[in-house]
């Protein structure tokens, strides 16, 4: 079974980094409503588009998701 996207993303937290992956990790950590137990692209993408209290480049998200799948 694959780790949830959130669990994987938390391994990428680095407040000193300007990489999109580290930025998303820090934003997701601060967002209490972020879907923490899913590995479903549509669920996470929909959350980022419609419910997140922050904005994030969805093109960067697509690249990060691809990296998650390859991990």
Curated annotation (Swiss-Prot):
Pfam families: YozE_SAM_like. InterPro entries: UPF0346, YozE_SAM-like, YozE_SAM-like_sf. NCBIfam families: PRK13672.1. Belongs to the UPF0346 family. This is UPF0346 protein SP_0947. It comes from Streptococcus pneumoniae serotype 4 (strain ATCC BAA-334 / TIGR4). The lineage of its organism: Bacteria, Bacillati, Bacillota, Bacilli, Lactobacillales.
């Amino acid at each position: 079974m694959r780790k949830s996207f959130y669990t994987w993303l938390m391994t990428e937290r680095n407040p000193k980094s300007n990489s999109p992956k580290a930025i998303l990790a820090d934003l997701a950590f601060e967002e209490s409503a972020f879907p923490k137990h899913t590995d479903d692209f549509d669920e996470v993408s929909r959350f980022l588009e419609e419910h997140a209290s922050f904005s994030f480049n969805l093109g960067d998200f697509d690249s990060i998701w691809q990296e998650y799948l390859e991990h």
